[in-house]
Amino acid sequence: MMKKSATTSSACNGCPAHSGNKLRRMGTDAERYDFTIALAGNPNTGKSTVFNALTGLKQHTGNWPGKTVEKAEGAFSYAGSSYKIVDLPGTYSLLSTSEDEEIARDFILFGKPDVTLIVADATRLERNMNLILQILEITDRAVLCANLMDEAERNGVEIDLRGLSRRLGIPVVGASARSGEGISDLLSALSEVAQGIYRCTPHRLTSIGTEIDTRIDSLAESIRLFHPDTPNSRWLALRLTEGDRRVENILYADNEAPAEKLKKEVDEFRRNFGEDLHDQLSEALYSDAGKICQEVITQANKRGRTPLDIKIDRIVTSRKWGFPIMLLMLALVLWITIVGSNYPSQWLSDSLVGILHPLLKTRATGFLPDWLSGFLIDGVYLATAWVVSVMLPPMAIFFPLFTLLEDFGFLPRVAFNLDELFRRSGAHGKQALTMTMGFGCNAAAIINTRIIDSQRERLIAILTNNFSLCNGRWPTQILLATIFLTPAVPAYLRGVIGIGSVVAIALLGIAFMFFFSWVLSRTLLRGQVSTFNLELPPYRPPQFWQTIYKSIVDRTLVVLWRAVVFAAPAGALIWLTCNIQIGGVGIAEYLIDLLDGPGWLMGLNGVILLAYVLAIPANEIVIPTILMLTVLTTGIDGGTGAGVMFEADGTAETARLFEAGGWTMLTGINLMLFCLLHNPCSTTLFNIYKETGSRKWTLLAALIPLATGFVVTVAVAFVWRLVGG
């Protein structure tokens, strides 16, 4: 039970008026609503958990900063009124100009929500207070949810919520959103503020100085005079004095007298009180935050963390053990993924390719023309079936494991360990987080680069993320390591060599990411490395089954659907290139002959290069395409027709086909390298263009890894042939 000083519970909370049965979760049905709620707060405070508890949606939550990178909307109804709730990106401040901070600030300021629900971490309220006070400078209608009250109690933190409410001038509710405790009180507070029953008198900065405060009020009055429809003129006045470009663009939209008068007032303010008010404003915020927290927080554990957390971090983030543990965890996740996905992948392949494909062909005979049957069943269907059978089982294992590590709190420690390396390479420390996301899916990681404040450093993260070996490329690496590397060692070492070689490829990708971040930061994207706060969240036991469900639904199936959308037309294209002939020779054979020259230079062949061209929509269909093209060019037994992708019966049969195609150990090793170092898939390229809005940066993101792959494979092939004769 929570201590009385750390909860808002009262004797009446059990009555119907305060029970949660008035809540009706409406998911995304927000077309008609009476009130709008902005959901704001620091990263990793449980905002998304509160959002899910109110709306019934399943937005992904994780135990690390930066999970929400854009606005998510949901709806609920309570006590006869309907509400739209907008989950804003988590941010530590509203005073700078990163994308997530601008989204949050602009919605609270210009979106005019009826209530701003601020979610704070009760175990670290003093760290959250800075943002709370900034939000209260913007809006007059807010509710504070002190979340994670159960953890606060375990850590010996007691909060006088009534005293905090008096000091802030807004309702304050204690809650534990994961268990649903306090949600009914939160709903009641939101309803009262939205309907005007509770009149907020929000805290205003008191440590900024009387003279500055008077001048700010005078400038705010001028803004109200010239722009009467603009919300919160005081906050806009503060931002004008700091030179906020977006606010200047809004208020200086014309060059007429009002704009000139405002500019003169701002210039006079800066002459009297300095060019930069930022330091003084920050000092005032920290001063007020410190005074408030000192009054309302009693903390038995002054460090705010359990001794066990501290002991674990001394090992996990140490210089001696941090990297070995990180590599061990990566190897363990890979091993579980590899071993666990073998049988499900085989079962799906047997079902979708071995049973359903021939059945569809039989049913189509006499019903569809041969060319249409081949196009739809051998092309579109078979490519889609391959993507599902090869991609679904590893993702269904990898993503839940990845998410469990998120929820436990391990991934921020990985970012902490890698931060210094990224800083030295001229990149932002948060790139460590997007790099880790890239191991699951590069396309998703590109979107999550929004957590990086600096546009320059965000571009570096986008341009180099493809060096993270994504989930779609793991099966190819594993197959090649099994066929070409493990047979050269004793049987008892084969598992270690197989896993070790794949981990080595992944580490090589990280090394290239550091290298190109360093190059870009000193050439095309010069600039100073930004500083940032990386908060190490407490270790939390994951909600196991809920995490499994969410990771499969929100990640695995979403990524799989995107891959299928691109794989289906790719299958059609592959079938067409193999079956359309010119002068009695298929287009595919012409292209293979054309690519054999550069393929030989790279230690590969024309079949492999054409497979990568045709399989650009999805990395998962590279190996089936290679096998199909190998059968087409060699004329050996295998497959069921031109342009029909298939899988050999086991690695031994696959090895036989590779050998028939003229493959050597050099081919296998260089294909492992090229699998890492080639252009992003079409889904990732689409996301890059969407995030950058630039064809130039999208093209560069494709050329950097592709050119690197060409140079590396040519160099390896040259040395190999030189040494081997």
From Swiss-Prot:
UniProt entry keywords in alphabetical sequence: Cell inner membrane, Cell membrane, GTP-binding, Manganese, Membrane, Nucleotide-binding, Transmembrane, Transmembrane helix, Transport
Binding site for GTP 2: 66-70
Residue numbers binding GTP 3: 87-90
UniProt GO MF annotations: ferrous iron transmembrane transporter activity; GTP binding
Summary of the knockout phenotype: A 3-fold increase in intracellular manganese levels.
Membrane topology: Multi-pass membrane protein
Domain FeoB-type G: 34-196
GO cellular component term, pick one: plasma membrane
PANTHER family in UniProt: FERROUS IRON TRANSPORT PROTEIN B
Family membership: Belongs to the TRAFAC class TrmE-Era-EngA-EngB-Septin-like GTPase superfamily. FeoB GTPase (TC 9.A.8) family.
NCBIfam families referenced in this protein's UniProt entry, alphabetically: feoB
Function as written in the Swiss-Prot or TrEMBL entry: Not involved in Fe(2+) uptake but is involved in manganese uptake. Could be GTP-driven.
Protein name: Fe(2+) transporter FeoB homolog
Source lineage: Bacteria, Pseudomonadati, Bacteroidota, Bacteroidia, Bacteroidales
Gene name of this polypeptide: feoB2
